[in-house]
Every structure is written in C-alpha cells, then in structure tokens.
C-alpha cells in the first residue's frame, strides 16, 4: 500500500467524482482509476460503488476513509519534521474559503505564503460555508479555513482577522436604488437572496439579525450556496441581498450597493484550525496570517 494510493482514494472520496479528483491531483483519470483498483485489490474490499452517473463510498470505503486520512496526515507530519530539522519548511496546506467574502484576505495570505514559504504548496478549497468547513476541519480534510466568526466548537481554535460593515445590494432598477442610505424596514416586502439555513453561514445569520433589528423577518426568495451567485441573482431581479461592503464593490454592473441604516452588526472575518500540535507547514501559514492581519 502506497501513500499515493491513499491520496487518490481520499480525493475520490471527497469529490465523489473521478474526473474532478484527477484534476485536483493533477493526473489523468485513467491512472487514478487504476490506482483505486490496486488499493481495492490489496484491501480485498470494494471501496466505491460506481455507475455512469455517480460515485458513492461503500460501507468499507466509509470505514477506511478516516484511517486513510490519518496515515496520509502522519506521513506529511513525518516529512515536514525531517525538513524542519534541516531548517526547511515543506508541505501542502489545505485552506478552505467561502468565495467572494474572502475577496481581500485570501489573495493577501496566498501572496505572502508564496513569498515567505516558497516550498509550501497551498491547496485552496472554495465554496465551503461555515458548517461544512467546520466538518472538514474536524475530519482533517482541511488544515485551515477562512470563515465568519463566532464558531462554537471547543476543539477549534479561531482568531479574528478583520471586521467589515454590511451593505445592501439591489437591482439597478429597484425603487430604492437612488437612495444614499437604506433603512432595511423599507425592504420588508422584498424577497431576500441568501445562503441556505443548513449551511450555518454567518452571511445568512447576519441577514436575519439585521432584519430583526429593523423589525421584520426577511422573506427568502432564493437560497444559494455561493455568495457571489447571490449577487448575480439580485442583478437578475430575483431579490435583494445583504452582503459585506467590500463584496458589494464587486457586485455585477446591473446592481447597486448601498450602506444600511442598521449597522450594529459587522462581519467578523476569522481564521480557524484544529487545536493541538499541528504540522509544521500548517503552523507556519497560521503564523503568517496572524502577522499580516491586524483587526
């Protein structure tokens, strides 16, 4: 059994799609399929149920996944320890992020890591809203995640890295598009575009909190996992959305973003990781983040 077999298995298990897993690993799909077959042959168990439309983990695959992650993580720790003993930091660090909400933090962190840690490869994993990101941290599928705070989990360490005010994004032809400031109570009859409740996103929670401050419960016209797609839907007339000021600057041209009267709530951008002694490369990236972000 080879580490690369386990890495291939983990990629397919997380993507549930051979083509996507192959792209993630930077290899053709055919060798990846052969690698999985070798692993299944060595274990004497089928790890995936495959069809022309879907890939699913078998019971054996689900049981094997945490052990595979543990072996790969231990091997990474060992490699990094050997390199660290020679004064070199080498490794792969997987960073989760939600998308456009990280428009300023993720590019800056990535740039600084490239400058300061040239032998550390970053694997940037997008479209991870709060609840899924926490789950992936706990599973070891992510090393670090950028997310909204607070996070209520005793096993996860967090640090505040920035604060950002909210604004409202409206279609360009909205009746309030020409205002300087919007009182959210004037949007009580509008539909809101936001993230799904099951995602546990601070983006959604803040929408409800700000609307409650204005005295109403928002009517949700559409839910979508991607915060930037929410802005595109606003431009298409599906509804209005509450987002951060910086994200509003990136909104499509058929929308307007305006400050809101209710401003007691700010988005608390944070960085999160599992508590305890981590890998050398992961901890070095965390140190850089805490150095460059001063809330």
Swiss-Prot record:
Transmembrane segments: none annotated. Keywords: Activator, DNA-binding, Transcription, Transcription regulation. The lineage of its organism: Bacteria, Bacillati, Actinomycetota, Actinomycetes, Mycobacteriales. It comes from the Bacteria. Residues 18-37 bind DNA. GO terms for cellular component: protein-DNA complex. Residues 1-58 form the HTH lysR-type domain. CDD domains: PBP2_LTTR_aromatics_like. The gene is shiR. One of its GO terms (molecular function) is DNA-binding transcription factor activity. Belongs to the LysR transcriptional regulatory family. Activates expression of the shikimate transporter ShiA in the presence of shikimate. Binds to the shiA promoter region. This is HTH-type transcriptional regulator ShiR. It holds the Pfam family LysR_substrate.
């Amino acid at each position: 059994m080879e580490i690369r077999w386990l890495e291939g298995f983990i990629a397919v298990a997380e993507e549930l799609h051979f083509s996507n897993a192959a792209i993630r690993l930077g290899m053709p799909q055919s060798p990846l399929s052969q690698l999985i077959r070798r692993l299944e042959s060595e274990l004497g168990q089928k790890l995936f149920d495959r069809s022309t439309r879907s890939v699913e983990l078998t019971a054996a695959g689900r049981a094997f996944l945490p052990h595979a992650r543990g072996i790969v993580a231990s091997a990474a720790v060992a490699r990094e320890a050997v390199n660290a003993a020679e004064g070199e930091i080498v490794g792969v660090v997987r960073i989760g992020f939600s998308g456009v909400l990280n428009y300023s933090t993720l590019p800056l962190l990535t740039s600084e890591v490239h400058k300061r840690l040239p032998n550390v490869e970053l694997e940037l994993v997008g479209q991870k809203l709060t609840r899924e990101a926490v789950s992936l941290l706990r599973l070891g599928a992510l090393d670090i995640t950028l997310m909204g705070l607070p996070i209520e989990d005793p096993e996860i360490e967090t640090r505040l890295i920035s604060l950002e005010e909210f604004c409202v994004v409206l279609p360009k032809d909205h009746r309030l598009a020409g205002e300087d400031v919007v009182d959210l109570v004037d949007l009580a009859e509008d539909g809101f575009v936001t993230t799904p409740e099951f995602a546990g996103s601070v983006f959604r929670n803040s929408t409800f909190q700000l609307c409650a401050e204005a005295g109403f419960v928002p009517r949700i016209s559409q839910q979508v996992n991607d915060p930037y797609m929410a802005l595109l839907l606003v431009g298409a007339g599906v509804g209005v959305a509450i987002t951060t000021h910086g994200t509003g600057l990136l909104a499509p041209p058929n929308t307007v973003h305006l400050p809101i009267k209710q401003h007691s709530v700010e988005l608390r951008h944070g960085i999160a990781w599992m508590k305890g002694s981590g890998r050398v490369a992961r901890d070095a990236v965390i140190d850089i983040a805490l150095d460059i972000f001063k809330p």
